[in-house]
A protein has these predicted regions:
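Conserved MFS/SLC helix-loop-helix module at the cytosolic interface between two early adjacent transmembrane helices
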Residues: 59-98
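Helix-to-loop junctions at the C-terminal end of transmembrane segments
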Residues: 60-72, 155, 257-269, 350-351
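C-terminal transmembrane helical hairpin of 12-TM major facilitator-type secondary transporters
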Residues: 268-315
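Extracytoplasmic gate region of multi-pass secondary transporters
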Residues: 28-29, 204-256
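Helix-breaking motifs and short loop linkers at transmembrane-helix boundaries and internal kinks
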Residues: 40, 72, 93-98, 127, ...
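Helix-loop-helix hairpin linking two adjacent transmembrane segments in secondary transporters
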Residues: 128-129, 134-182
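Cytoplasmic helix-loop-helix junction between adjacent transmembrane helices
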Residues: 103-138
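Residue-level signature of mid-helix packing/kink "hotspots" within the transmembrane helices
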Residues: 26, 53-62, 145, 251-259, ...
Length: 383
């Protein structure tokens, strides 16, 4: 009976820290624009800072997969999640490009580390993994929805105050992890009592298919998140300040979908559900690229985000007992590389053939979602 309250506490710690992580991580896109206005650096520097954050996020996954075998799970999480407080704190000190570069890299490290830690805490301590993961990502979406209003309010006083608020939230994340008992989370024990890394998941075909599916999901989702505002403005479909609120449309759809999956319409057959979601994403994205009116564009963007919302948490939950600190340290960063690669490809294609052609390329990872989901659905279930 004592185990149940402990599991609930660990799961809730994952929910709460992922909510704050949603604020800190998504705020980076707003912060970089504030810093650009304040210090006047070029657009190339803006792209570099965001790329460094993505690289930090990628590296964090590998570090959280290896460091627990040396330091233990909790010390590793505490070390790596200092990045939010340190990163945003350093941004407020100076506009030096080197310091800003290090700051965004540290924020990326914290983002990836929090993702890994929360996945372990929630997935390993939820009776229903699919519901738990969808609820966890709903917490992140709530934070993402809140961050523009929080930064705007603090930014009215000064950019420095906005950065200080984010650094304070980073400290809160760290303190929650500090006070959460995490012994034995995401690891196995050897006869000597030390944590032993289990690499058996590397031999699982299902693990690599799920990683491929998440790679496509990250690629498709980040491309829309990163490029859609620019695409809408450039094409004249949505103009002015309204274009910036398309991000709110996406996160609103994401939150609604994940809450519905978690509480109203839970998936009885998650693998088949991923196939349906993949098909939905592909169809809605195809018609989104054909939209020429503001109403149709917003409606199709909402539908795309709604269809995409359950893919990531459902795929991670489908990993079952393969969900360990080490396996997530391989799966999540490998998958997140799609979020680095596809937006870059769109940019390169757009330079040569126009942004419309570049955005059309994003249909490729959407189709990849369908193919990987079908392959996963045909695999024998691994608990």
């Amino acid at each position: 009976m004592e185990q149940q309250p402990q599991n609930t506490r660990l799961r809730n710690a994952g929910f709460l820290t992922f909510f704050f992580s949603g604020i800190c991580a998504i705020s980076s896109g707003v912060v970089v624009s504030l810093l650009q206005e304040k210090y006047g650096f070029a657009y190339g520097m803006t792209g570099t800072l965001l790329s460094l954050m993505s690289i930090g996020n990628l590296l964090a996954g590998f570090l959280t997969g290896v460091l627990p075998g040396v330091l233990g799970f909790k010390p590793s999480v505490l070390l790596l999640t200092t990045g939010y407080a340190l990163g945003y704190g350093m941004m407020g000190l100076s506009g030096a490009e080197l310091l800003l570069s290090v700051s965004f890299f540290l924020v990326g490290i914290a983002k990836g580390s929090a993702m890994n830690a929360c996945t372990i805490l929630v997935s390993g301590n939820s009776a229903d993994r699919t519901r738990g993961m969808n609820l966890m990502h709903s917490c992140y979406a709530c934070g993402a929805l809140l961050c523009p209003f929080l930064i705007a309010a603090a930014g009215r006083v000064s950019t420095g105050l906005a950065l200080l608020v984010l650094a304070a939230l980073g400290i809160i994340v760290w303190l929650i992890y500090l006070t959460t008992p995490m012994d034995g989370q995401g690891s196995t024990k050897s006869k000597t009592g030390k944590e032993k890394i289990d690499w058996s998941f590397l031999h699982s075909v299902q693990f690599w298919l799920l990683t491929g599916l998440l790679f496509c999901q990250n690629a498709a989702e980040q491309s829309v998140t990163g490029w859609m505002v620019t695409y809408f403005k450039g094409s004249g479909i949505i103009t002015g300040a309204l274009a910036a609120y398309t991000v709110t449309v996406m996160w609103g759809a994401t939150l609604v979908a994940r809450l519905l999956i978690a509480f109203v319409f839970p998936f009885k057959q998650p693998r088949k559900a991923m196939v349906v979601m993949g098909v939905g994403c592909t169809i809605f994205y195809f018609f989104l690229m054909q939209a020429h009116t503001q109403g149709a564009a917003i409606l199709l963007l909402f539908a795309f985000a709604f269809a995409m919302a359950g893919m990531n948490p459902t795929a991670v939950a489908s990993a079952g007992k393969m969900t360990s600190v080490t396996s997530m340290g391989i799966m999540l960063p490998a998958a997140s590389s799609g979020a680095i690669l596809m937006p870059w490809i769109i940019g390169r294609v757009a330079e040569r053939a126009g942004l419309a052609v570049g955005m059309a390329c994003n249909i490729v990872p959407c189709i990849g979602l369908v193919l990987f989901a079908i392959l996963v659905a045909r695999m024998p279930k691994e608990n």
